[in-house]
């Protein structure tokens, strides 16, 4: 039994902690990984086999990131891992490569060899895509289990006995409970990605039940951008003598990210937003708002102003969420308006700017939001629109980061000249939402049909362009 079996785990069900705990050497406490004398410059130097080195090269991974360089050797030795790294640091590769390499060592690769849990559907699909890309040349099969997708189709996929299962806790538990012939009783690897989010109350029961039915003798990788108290307690409960690899401070942003904020009156926030967008023509931009309704309203308003904007939120069906993401990734639309459903783990290449239209009440969400840009060593820009009611939340963000974010001034005349046109566009957007059944209960039949709205949304004649030359 674990040496510290009397550890209090307030946030976790005590029975689950007991069920999840595995025999742990040295009390199950993590060991800090010793940094290598020289950071390996190739995947081959890390011990990755040639087949996977070739797969990395095909994906454009020329050299390992810092977290990959520090985590992969320990994972290849069969150690449990705690990996802490900033968003965009390459955490997926850090656990996917060792799992695939362990599978390659088997004479007959085992079905249902590894399971990866993700807090969001989009991140689950992204992880699945990376597994398939890395394993494409060696016949790796992967199934993604998330809500919003037909369960019968997923059951058919599970019947084919994939090597890897990636899913959200709720849908995975549905299949463990209801899908005949499916179990994880021979599972060799469990990965908890974005672990701090997985420990939220909305996932707790499903996660508890999953931990109760999988083998205790397994390798467990726990990855997160932040190390919270809950993550620390989970680590003591279900990892065996883990190695801790940390490539970031507890809450931090990358050095290549430039951050600023505007202090704006609440009634003029839309005007400041349009001002910022006009300063960034052609940029790939993610705008974060607080509610699902706000994503739709803001997308319609901006489209009425001739911006190429699309929204994504938790109220959309899975097909439409993926469709919106694909339109953004392919640059069909260069502005993605989203709730915090898009702040975790999504690896969208080329995001230049993150705009916090609504300031998050949870300071840690700010770190995840701005982590959508300045990824993999690239530069990025994050700007926040802070009104008088959000100033306290923004101060809490600065306290968490440990530094003050510089403010940016703007000529009020430039803002005021935008007000009338934006008001017209917003009024038209509100009318469109009302006529289309803007409230959640009325919208079920044609839920979040962005393309239909884009075709039918009326456009004010006054709002043809907001280029600077038009304003003067």
UniProtKB/Swiss-Prot annotation:
Induction cue: By high temperature and the circadian clock. Expression peaks at zeitgeber time 9 (ZT9) corresponding to afternoon of a subjective day, the hottest time of daily temperature fluctuation.
Binding site for ATP: 85-92
Low complexity bias spans: 17-26
GO biological process: one example: rRNA processing
EC number(s) given by UniProt: 3.6.4.13
InterPro entries in UniProt: DDX47/Rrp3_DEADc, DEAD/DEAH_box_helicase_dom, DEAD_box_RNA_helicase, Helicase_ATP-bd, Helicase_C-like, P-loop_NTPase, RNA-helicase_DEAD-box_CS, RNA_helicase_DEAD_Q_motif
Compositional bias segments (type: Basic residues): 461-472
Description of activity control: Helicase activity is activated by temperature increase.
Residues annotated as domain Helicase C-terminal: 256-416
Sequence segments annotated as region (Disordered): 1-40, 429-472
One Pfam assignment: DEAD
Enzyme class: hydrolase
Source species, domain of life: Eukaryota
Disruption phenotype: Thermosensitive dwarf mutant. Reduced plant height, root length and crown root number at 30, 32.5 and 35 degrees Celsius, whereas they grow similarly to wild-type at 25 degrees Celsius except for a slightly reduced plant height. At tillering stage, plants grown in a hot climate show narrowed leaf blades mainly due to a decrease in vascular bundle and lateral vein numbers, and all internodes are shortened.
Stated family: Belongs to the DEAD box helicase family. DDX47/RRP3 subfamily.
Record function comment: Has ATP-dependent RNA helicase activity in vitro. Acts as a thermosensitive RNA chaperone required for normal processing of pre-rRNA intermediates. Required for normal cell division at high temperatures. Required for a primary metabolism adaptation to high temperatures to support thermotolerant growth by regulating gene expression. Partially rescues the yeast rRNA helicase RRP3 mutant which has repressed cell proliferation at 38 degrees Celsius.
Protein name: DEAD-box ATP-dependent RNA helicase 10
Organism of origin: Oryza sativa subsp. indica
């Amino acid at each position: 039994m674990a040496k510290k079996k009397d550890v209090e785990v307030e946030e976790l069900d005590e029975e689950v902690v007991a069920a999840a705990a595995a025999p742990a050497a040295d009390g199950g406490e993590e060991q800090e990984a010793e940094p290598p004398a020289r950071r390996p410059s190739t995947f081959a130097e890390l011990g990755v086999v040639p087949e996977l080195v070739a797969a990395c090269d095909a994906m454009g991974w020329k050299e390992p990131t810092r977290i990959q360089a520090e985590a992969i050797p320990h994972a290849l030795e069969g150690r449990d891992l705690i990996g802490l790294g900033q968003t965009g640091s390459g955490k997926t590769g850090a656990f996917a490569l060792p799992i695939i390499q362990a599978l390659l060592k088997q004479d007959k690769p085992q079905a249902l060899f590894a399971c990866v849990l993700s807090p969001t559907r989009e991140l689950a699909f992204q992880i699945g895509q990376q597994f398939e890309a890395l394993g494409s040349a060696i016949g790796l099969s992967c199934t993604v289990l998330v809500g919003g997708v037909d369960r019968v189709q997923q059951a058919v996929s599970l019947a084919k006995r994939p090597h890897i299962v990636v899913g959200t806790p709720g849908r995975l538990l549905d299949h463990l409970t209801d899908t005949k012939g499916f179990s994880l009783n021979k599972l060799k690897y469990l990965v908890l990605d974005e672990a701090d989010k997985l420990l939220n109350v909305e996932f707790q029961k499903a996660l508890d039940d999953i931990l109760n039915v999988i083998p205790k003798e397994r390798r467990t990788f726990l990855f997160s951008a932040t190390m919270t108290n809950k993550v620390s307690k989970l680590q003591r409960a279900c990892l065996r003598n883990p190695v801790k690899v940390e490539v970031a401070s507890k809450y931090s942003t990358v050095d290549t990210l430039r951050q600023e904020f505007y202090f704006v009156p609440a009634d003029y926030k839309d005007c400041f937003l349009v001002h910022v967008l006009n300063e960034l023509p052609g940029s790939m931009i993610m705008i974060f708002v607080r509610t699902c309704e706000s994503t739709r309203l803001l997308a319609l308003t901006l489209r009425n102003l001739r911006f190429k904007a699309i929204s994504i939120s938790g109220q959309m069906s899975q097909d439409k969420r993926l469709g919106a993401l694909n339109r953004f990734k392919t640059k069909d639309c260069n502005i993605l308006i989203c709730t915090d459903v898009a702040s975790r783990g999504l690896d969208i290449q080329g995001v230049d700017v993150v705009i916090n239209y609504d300031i998050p009440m949870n300071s840690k969400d700010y770190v995840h939001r701005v982590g959508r840009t300045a990824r993999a060593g690239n530069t990025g820009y994050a700007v926040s629109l802070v009104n008088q009611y959000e100033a306290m939340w923004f101060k809490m963000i600065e306290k968490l980061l440990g530094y003050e974010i510089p403010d940016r001034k703007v000529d009020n005349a430039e803002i005021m000249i935008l007000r009338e046109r934006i008001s017209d566009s917003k009024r038209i957007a509100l009318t469109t939402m009302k006529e289309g059944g803007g409230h959640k209960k009325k919208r079920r039949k044609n839920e979040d049909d962005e393309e239909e709205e884009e075709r039918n949304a009326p456009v004010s004649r006054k709002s043809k362009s907001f280029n600077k030359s038009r304003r003067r």
